[in-house]
A protein has these predicted regions:
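Nucleotide-sugar donor-binding patch of glycosyltransferase catalytic domains
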Residues: 247-248, 291-335
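Conserved nucleotide-sugar phosphate-binding/catalytic loop shared by glycosyltransferases and other
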Residues: 9, 27-86
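Active-site-proximal region of nucleotide-activated glycan assembly enzymes
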Residues: 124-189
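Donor-nucleotide binding loops and adjacent catalytic segments primarily
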Residues: 193-269
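C-terminal amphipathic helix plus adjacent low-complexity
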Residues: 327-384
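Conserved nucleotide-sugar donor-binding subdomain of glycosyltransferases
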Residues: 72-108, 115-116
Protein backbone atom coordinates (compact mmCIF):
# COMPACT_ATOMS: atom_id res chain seq x y z
CA UNK A 1 0.00 0.00 0.00
CA UNK A 2 0.97 3.59 -0.63
CA UNK A 3 -0.17 5.62 2.37
CA UNK A 4 -0.66 9.32 3.05
CA UNK A 5 -0.81 10.54 6.67
CA UNK A 6 -2.83 13.58 7.75
CA UNK A 7 -2.01 14.42 11.37
CA UNK A 8 -3.41 16.85 13.92
CA UNK A 9 -0.37 18.72 15.24
CA UNK A 10 -1.87 19.85 18.55
CA UNK A 11 0.10 18.39 21.45
CA UNK A 12 2.37 15.36 21.25
CA UNK A 13 -0.01 12.39 21.10
CA UNK A 14 -1.13 12.24 17.47
CA UNK A 15 2.42 12.89 16.29
CA UNK A 16 3.84 9.95 18.24
CA UNK A 17 0.95 7.77 17.03
CA UNK A 18 1.94 8.62 13.46
CA UNK A 19 5.55 7.67 14.20
CA UNK A 20 4.43 4.36 15.72
CA UNK A 21 2.22 3.49 12.75
CA UNK A 22 5.00 4.46 10.36
CA UNK A 23 7.21 1.78 12.00
CA UNK A 24 4.47 -0.84 11.65
CA UNK A 25 3.65 -0.03 8.02
CA UNK A 26 7.28 0.01 6.91
CA UNK A 27 7.88 -3.30 8.69
CA UNK A 28 4.99 -4.78 6.68
CA UNK A 29 6.48 -3.53 3.41
CA UNK A 30 4.18 -0.55 2.83
CA UNK A 31 5.22 2.98 1.82
CA UNK A 32 4.44 6.37 3.38
CA UNK A 33 4.32 8.72 0.38
CA UNK A 34 3.43 11.99 2.14
CA UNK A 35 2.72 13.43 5.58
CA UNK A 36 0.51 16.48 6.11
CA UNK A 37 0.44 18.08 9.58
CA UNK A 38 -2.07 20.63 10.87
CA UNK A 39 -0.40 23.52 12.67
CA UNK A 40 -1.29 26.74 14.45
CA UNK A 41 0.67 29.82 15.36
CA UNK A 42 0.36 28.87 19.05
CA UNK A 43 2.18 25.55 18.67
CA UNK A 44 5.45 24.53 17.11
CA UNK A 45 5.71 21.07 15.52
CA UNK A 46 8.41 19.28 17.59
CA UNK A 47 11.73 18.72 15.87
CA UNK A 48 11.77 15.06 16.93
CA UNK A 49 8.72 14.40 14.74
CA UNK A 50 10.04 16.20 11.67
CA UNK A 51 13.32 14.29 12.03
CA UNK A 52 11.92 10.81 12.75
CA UNK A 53 9.04 10.72 10.26
CA UNK A 54 11.66 10.63 7.46
CA UNK A 55 9.16 11.38 4.69
CA UNK A 56 8.14 14.45 2.62
CA UNK A 57 6.21 16.52 5.17
CA UNK A 58 4.15 19.67 4.68
CA UNK A 59 2.25 21.84 7.15
CA UNK A 60 -1.12 23.56 6.85
CA UNK A 61 -3.18 25.87 9.06
CA UNK A 62 -5.68 24.00 11.21
CA UNK A 63 -8.17 24.88 14.00
CA UNK A 64 -6.92 24.68 17.55
CA UNK A 65 -7.95 25.50 21.10
CA UNK A 66 -6.79 28.73 22.72
CA UNK A 67 -5.71 28.68 26.36
CA UNK A 68 -7.26 30.85 29.05
CA UNK A 69 -5.50 34.04 30.15
CA UNK A 70 -3.48 32.16 32.76
CA UNK A 71 -2.38 29.72 29.99
CA UNK A 72 -3.69 26.67 31.83
CA UNK A 73 -7.11 25.42 30.75
CA UNK A 74 -8.55 25.91 27.26
CA UNK A 75 -11.25 28.54 26.69
CA UNK A 76 -14.04 27.16 24.47
CA UNK A 77 -15.78 30.45 23.56
CA UNK A 78 -12.50 32.22 22.89
CA UNK A 79 -11.35 29.31 20.71
CA UNK A 80 -14.60 29.28 18.70
CA UNK A 81 -14.44 33.04 18.09
CA UNK A 82 -10.77 32.89 17.11
CA UNK A 83 -11.20 29.98 14.70
CA UNK A 84 -14.26 31.55 13.06
CA UNK A 85 -12.06 34.47 11.97
CA UNK A 86 -9.68 32.05 10.26
CA UNK A 87 -12.28 30.26 8.12
CA UNK A 88 -10.78 31.62 4.84
CA UNK A 89 -7.40 30.18 5.86
CA UNK A 90 -9.01 26.81 6.66
CA UNK A 91 -10.74 26.75 3.27
CA UNK A 92 -7.30 27.17 1.71
CA UNK A 93 -6.08 24.28 3.88
CA UNK A 94 -8.92 22.06 2.63
CA UNK A 95 -7.87 22.77 -0.95
CA UNK A 96 -4.25 22.11 0.03
CA UNK A 97 -5.18 18.71 1.53
CA UNK A 98 -7.29 17.84 -1.53
CA UNK A 99 -4.48 18.71 -3.93
CA UNK A 100 -1.87 16.73 -1.97
CA UNK A 101 -4.06 13.64 -1.68
CA UNK A 102 -4.83 13.70 -5.40
CA UNK A 103 -1.20 14.17 -6.39
CA UNK A 104 0.29 11.72 -3.85
CA UNK A 105 -0.72 8.54 -5.68
CA UNK A 106 -1.75 7.09 -2.30
CA UNK A 107 -3.94 3.98 -2.03
CA UNK A 108 -5.24 4.89 1.42
CA UNK A 109 -5.52 7.91 3.74
CA UNK A 110 -4.72 7.58 7.45
CA UNK A 111 -6.27 10.48 9.36
CA UNK A 112 -4.96 11.10 12.89
CA UNK A 113 -7.95 13.13 14.17
CA UNK A 114 -7.46 16.08 11.83
CA UNK A 115 -10.83 17.83 11.38
CA UNK A 116 -9.96 19.47 8.05
CA UNK A 117 -9.07 16.07 6.60
CA UNK A 118 -12.48 14.80 7.71
CA UNK A 119 -14.18 17.70 5.94
CA UNK A 120 -12.02 17.29 2.83
CA UNK A 121 -12.77 13.56 2.55
CA UNK A 122 -16.51 14.25 2.91
CA UNK A 123 -16.49 16.89 0.14
CA UNK A 124 -14.33 15.20 -2.49
CA UNK A 125 -14.47 11.66 -3.83
CA UNK A 126 -10.86 10.50 -4.02
CA UNK A 127 -11.61 6.89 -4.87
CA UNK A 128 -9.45 5.62 -1.99
CA UNK A 129 -10.37 4.56 1.58
CA UNK A 130 -9.80 6.62 4.72
CA UNK A 131 -9.03 5.12 8.11
CA UNK A 132 -9.34 7.46 11.10
CA UNK A 133 -7.21 6.73 14.17
CA UNK A 134 -7.48 8.25 17.64
CA UNK A 135 -8.60 7.51 21.17
CA UNK A 136 -11.34 10.13 20.68
CA UNK A 137 -13.38 7.70 18.57
CA UNK A 138 -14.02 5.80 21.78
CA UNK A 139 -16.26 8.76 22.77
CA UNK A 140 -18.66 7.63 20.00
CA UNK A 141 -18.79 4.08 21.38
CA UNK A 142 -22.08 3.30 23.19
CA UNK A 143 -20.20 1.54 26.02
CA UNK A 144 -17.98 4.53 26.83
CA UNK A 145 -19.30 6.65 29.68
CA UNK A 146 -18.59 10.40 29.47
CA UNK A 147 -17.92 12.36 32.69
CA UNK A 148 -21.34 14.09 32.51
CA UNK A 149 -20.04 17.24 34.24
CA UNK A 150 -20.08 19.48 31.16
CA UNK A 151 -23.06 18.55 28.90
CA UNK A 152 -22.50 21.22 26.22
CA UNK A 153 -18.70 20.78 25.83
CA UNK A 154 -19.16 16.98 25.82
CA UNK A 155 -21.83 17.28 23.10
CA UNK A 156 -19.57 19.57 21.04
CA UNK A 157 -16.64 17.17 21.51
CA UNK A 158 -18.69 14.35 20.04
CA UNK A 159 -19.84 16.58 17.15
CA UNK A 160 -16.23 17.59 16.46
CA UNK A 161 -15.14 13.94 16.58
CA UNK A 162 -17.85 12.96 14.08
CA UNK A 163 -16.70 15.71 11.70
CA UNK A 164 -13.14 14.35 11.74
CA UNK A 165 -14.41 11.01 10.40
CA UNK A 166 -17.19 11.98 7.95
CA UNK A 167 -17.62 9.19 5.38
CA UNK A 168 -14.54 7.39 6.77
CA UNK A 169 -14.14 3.74 5.78
CA UNK A 170 -13.23 2.72 9.33
CA UNK A 171 -12.56 4.34 12.70
CA UNK A 172 -9.91 2.84 14.98
CA UNK A 173 -10.61 3.77 18.60
CA UNK A 174 -7.41 3.52 20.64
CA UNK A 175 -8.29 2.32 24.12
CA UNK A 176 -6.71 1.28 27.42
CA UNK A 177 -8.99 -1.76 27.46
CA UNK A 178 -11.09 -3.71 24.99
CA UNK A 179 -14.64 -2.31 24.87
CA UNK A 180 -15.53 -4.55 21.93
CA UNK A 181 -16.19 -3.33 18.40
CA UNK A 182 -19.19 -1.21 17.43
CA UNK A 183 -19.95 -2.27 13.87
CA UNK A 184 -23.02 -0.02 13.61
CA UNK A 185 -20.79 3.07 13.86
CA UNK A 186 -17.83 1.54 12.02
CA UNK A 187 -15.71 1.58 15.19
CA UNK A 188 -12.94 -0.96 15.76
CA UNK A 189 -11.47 -0.87 19.28
CA UNK A 190 -7.70 -1.43 19.28
CA UNK A 191 -4.80 -1.05 21.75
CA UNK A 192 -2.90 2.27 21.90
CA UNK A 193 -0.30 3.04 19.23
CA UNK A 194 2.97 3.01 21.18
CA UNK A 195 6.32 3.06 19.47
CA UNK A 196 8.62 0.08 19.78
CA UNK A 197 11.12 2.22 21.69
CA UNK A 198 8.60 2.63 24.51
CA UNK A 199 8.33 -1.15 24.84
CA UNK A 200 12.05 -1.88 24.64
CA UNK A 201 13.41 0.93 26.83
CA UNK A 202 14.90 -0.48 30.04
CA UNK A 203 12.92 0.89 32.97
CA UNK A 204 13.69 1.30 36.64
CA UNK A 205 12.23 3.25 39.55
CA UNK A 206 14.32 6.31 40.34
CA UNK A 207 13.82 8.98 42.99
CA UNK A 208 12.43 11.80 40.81
CA UNK A 209 9.05 12.77 39.37
CA UNK A 210 8.66 13.56 35.68
CA UNK A 211 5.86 15.59 34.12
CA UNK A 212 4.48 16.95 30.87
CA UNK A 213 2.26 20.01 30.55
CA UNK A 214 0.53 21.04 27.34
CA UNK A 215 0.02 24.61 28.57
CA UNK A 216 2.98 26.43 30.10
CA UNK A 217 0.81 28.30 32.63
CA UNK A 218 0.94 25.27 34.91
CA UNK A 219 4.64 25.98 35.47
CA UNK A 220 3.66 28.41 38.24
CA UNK A 221 1.77 25.63 40.05
CA UNK A 222 4.80 23.39 39.79
CA UNK A 223 7.09 26.13 41.12
CA UNK A 224 4.72 26.85 44.01
CA UNK A 225 4.66 23.18 45.05
CA UNK A 226 8.42 22.96 44.60
CA UNK A 227 9.04 25.88 46.98
CA UNK A 228 7.28 23.91 49.72
CA UNK A 229 9.05 20.64 48.83
CA UNK A 230 12.51 21.63 47.60
CA UNK A 231 14.03 18.19 48.25
CA UNK A 232 11.84 16.36 45.69
CA UNK A 233 13.57 16.09 42.31
CA UNK A 234 11.29 17.30 39.48
CA UNK A 235 11.80 17.17 35.70
CA UNK A 236 8.97 18.74 33.68
CA UNK A 237 8.59 18.86 29.91
CA UNK A 238 6.71 21.55 27.99
CA UNK A 239 6.45 22.81 24.43
CA UNK A 240 6.89 26.51 25.22
CA UNK A 241 8.23 27.90 21.93
CA UNK A 242 10.51 30.61 23.37
CA UNK A 243 11.96 28.47 26.19
CA UNK A 244 15.55 27.17 26.15
CA UNK A 245 16.18 23.46 25.67
CA UNK A 246 16.75 23.16 29.42
CA UNK A 247 15.71 25.68 32.06
CA UNK A 248 17.22 24.74 35.42
CA UNK A 249 15.40 26.66 38.15
CA UNK A 250 17.58 25.14 40.87
CA UNK A 251 19.23 21.83 41.77
CA UNK A 252 15.94 19.92 42.02
CA UNK A 253 13.64 21.57 39.44
CA UNK A 254 14.30 21.57 35.69
CA UNK A 255 12.00 22.41 32.76
CA UNK A 256 12.84 20.73 29.46
CA UNK A 257 11.66 21.62 25.97
CA UNK A 258 9.83 18.55 24.65
CA UNK A 259 12.39 16.17 23.22
CA UNK A 260 11.15 12.68 22.62
CA UNK A 261 14.35 10.74 23.30
CA UNK A 262 14.98 12.65 26.51
CA UNK A 263 11.33 12.36 27.56
CA UNK A 264 11.28 8.56 27.26
CA UNK A 265 14.60 8.32 29.09
CA UNK A 266 13.26 10.32 32.04
CA UNK A 267 9.93 8.48 31.96
CA UNK A 268 11.66 5.08 32.11
CA UNK A 269 13.58 6.03 35.26
CA UNK A 270 11.03 8.08 37.20
CA UNK A 271 9.15 7.30 40.41
CA UNK A 272 5.84 8.70 39.10
CA UNK A 273 4.42 10.82 36.28
CA UNK A 274 2.27 14.00 36.26
CA UNK A 275 0.56 15.27 33.11
CA UNK A 276 -2.26 17.36 31.68
CA UNK A 277 -4.15 14.13 30.88
CA UNK A 278 -2.99 13.52 27.33
CA UNK A 279 -3.88 9.97 26.29
CA UNK A 280 -0.61 8.91 24.68
CA UNK A 281 1.84 9.68 27.46
CA UNK A 282 -0.50 8.16 30.06
CA UNK A 283 -0.43 4.91 28.05
CA UNK A 284 3.37 5.09 27.87
CA UNK A 285 3.53 5.51 31.65
CA UNK A 286 1.02 2.68 32.14
CA UNK A 287 3.09 0.34 29.97
CA UNK A 288 6.23 1.24 31.92
CA UNK A 289 4.46 0.67 35.23
CA UNK A 290 4.51 4.30 36.39
CA UNK A 291 1.71 5.74 38.55
CA UNK A 292 0.13 8.87 37.03
CA UNK A 293 -1.51 12.10 38.12
CA UNK A 294 -3.76 13.73 35.52
CA UNK A 295 -4.67 17.43 35.43
CA UNK A 296 -7.25 17.90 32.64
CA UNK A 297 -7.03 21.15 30.66
CA UNK A 298 -10.22 20.68 28.59
CA UNK A 299 -13.21 18.36 28.21
CA UNK A 300 -11.38 15.77 26.09
CA UNK A 301 -8.76 15.41 28.81
CA UNK A 302 -11.56 15.17 31.41
CA UNK A 303 -12.71 12.06 29.51
CA UNK A 304 -9.14 10.71 29.42
CA UNK A 305 -8.71 11.31 33.16
CA UNK A 306 -11.99 9.58 34.02
CA UNK A 307 -11.06 6.58 31.87
CA UNK A 308 -7.61 6.37 33.50
CA UNK A 309 -9.14 6.50 36.99
CA UNK A 310 -11.64 3.76 36.08
CA UNK A 311 -8.71 1.56 35.06
CA UNK A 312 -6.72 2.49 38.21
CA UNK A 313 -3.99 3.92 35.98
CA UNK A 314 -3.89 7.29 37.70
CA UNK A 315 -5.49 9.88 39.93
CA UNK A 316 -7.17 13.04 38.58
CA UNK A 317 -6.85 16.46 40.19
CA UNK A 318 -7.37 20.15 39.37
CA UNK A 319 -3.79 21.31 39.89
CA UNK A 320 -0.20 20.07 39.99
CA UNK A 321 -0.54 18.94 43.61
CA UNK A 322 2.20 16.33 43.64
CA UNK A 323 1.31 15.29 47.20
CA UNK A 324 -1.73 13.50 45.73
CA UNK A 325 0.51 11.71 43.24
CA UNK A 326 2.83 10.54 46.01
CA UNK A 327 -0.11 9.12 48.00
CA UNK A 328 -1.50 7.33 44.93
CA UNK A 329 1.95 5.94 44.06
CA UNK A 330 2.28 4.18 47.42
CA UNK A 331 -0.55 1.78 46.67
CA UNK A 332 -0.07 1.53 42.91
CA UNK A 333 0.26 -1.88 41.25
CA UNK A 334 1.40 -2.39 37.66
CA UNK A 335 -1.35 -3.27 35.19
CA UNK A 336 -0.19 -6.54 33.64
CA UNK A 337 -3.43 -6.91 31.64
CA UNK A 338 -2.77 -3.61 29.87
CA UNK A 339 0.70 -4.74 28.85
CA UNK A 340 -0.76 -7.95 27.40
CA UNK A 341 -3.47 -5.96 25.56
CA UNK A 342 -0.89 -3.52 24.20
CA UNK A 343 1.41 -6.30 23.00
CA UNK A 344 -1.24 -7.20 20.40
CA UNK A 345 -1.46 -3.61 19.09
CA UNK A 346 0.56 -4.15 15.91
CA UNK A 347 -1.40 -7.26 14.87
CA UNK A 348 -4.83 -5.76 15.62
CA UNK A 349 -4.17 -2.36 14.05
CA UNK A 350 -2.58 -3.77 10.90
CA UNK A 351 -5.45 -6.26 10.52
CA UNK A 352 -7.98 -3.42 10.84
CA UNK A 353 -6.23 -1.30 8.19
CA UNK A 354 -5.92 -4.27 5.82
CA UNK A 355 -9.60 -5.06 6.36
CA UNK A 356 -10.66 -1.47 5.59
CA UNK A 357 -8.46 -1.43 2.48
CA UNK A 358 -9.78 -4.74 1.14
CA UNK A 359 -13.42 -4.02 1.96
CA UNK A 360 -13.27 -0.64 0.23
CA UNK A 361 -11.71 -1.90 -2.99
CA UNK A 362 -13.85 -5.05 -3.08
CA UNK A 363 -16.96 -2.87 -2.78
CA UNK A 364 -15.65 -0.47 -5.43
CA UNK A 365 -15.00 -3.33 -7.87
CA UNK A 366 -18.51 -4.70 -7.25
CA UNK A 367 -20.04 -1.26 -7.87
CA UNK A 368 -18.04 -0.82 -11.09
CA UNK A 369 -19.07 -4.33 -12.23
CA UNK A 370 -22.75 -3.63 -11.46
CA UNK A 371 -22.53 -0.28 -13.27
CA UNK A 372 -20.98 -1.93 -16.36
CA UNK A 373 -23.63 -4.69 -16.25
CA UNK A 374 -26.37 -2.07 -16.04
CA UNK A 375 -24.89 -0.11 -18.95
CA UNK A 376 -24.77 -3.28 -21.11
CA UNK A 377 -28.41 -4.05 -20.26
CA UNK A 378 -29.49 -0.51 -21.17
CA UNK A 379 -27.48 -0.59 -24.41
CA UNK A 380 -29.02 -3.96 -25.35
CA UNK A 381 -32.51 -2.55 -24.74
CA UNK A 382 -31.96 0.35 -27.12
CA UNK A 383 -30.39 -1.90 -29.76
CA UNK A 384 -33.31 -4.37 -29.79
Amino acid sequence: MKVIFVVQGEGRGHLTQALALRQILLHEGHEIVKVLVGKSKNRKIPEFFLHQIDCPTELFDSPNFLPSKDNKRFCLLRSMAYNSLLVPSYISSINFIRKNIQESGADIIINFYEVLCGITYSLFHFGIPEVCIGHQYLFLHPSFQMPGKYPLPEFLLRVFTRITCLRATKKLALSIRDYGDNAANGIKVVPPLLRQKVKTTIRHHGNYIVGYMLNAGYAEDVKAWHQKHPHTQLHFFWDKADAPEELQVDETLTFHRINDVKFLKYMAGCKAYATTAGFESVCEALYMGKPCMLIPAHVEQECNALDAEREMAGVATDAFDIDKLKVFARGYEEDVEFRMWENYAEIRIMAAIDSAYNEYYDTTETCVYDEKKSNITIASFFQS
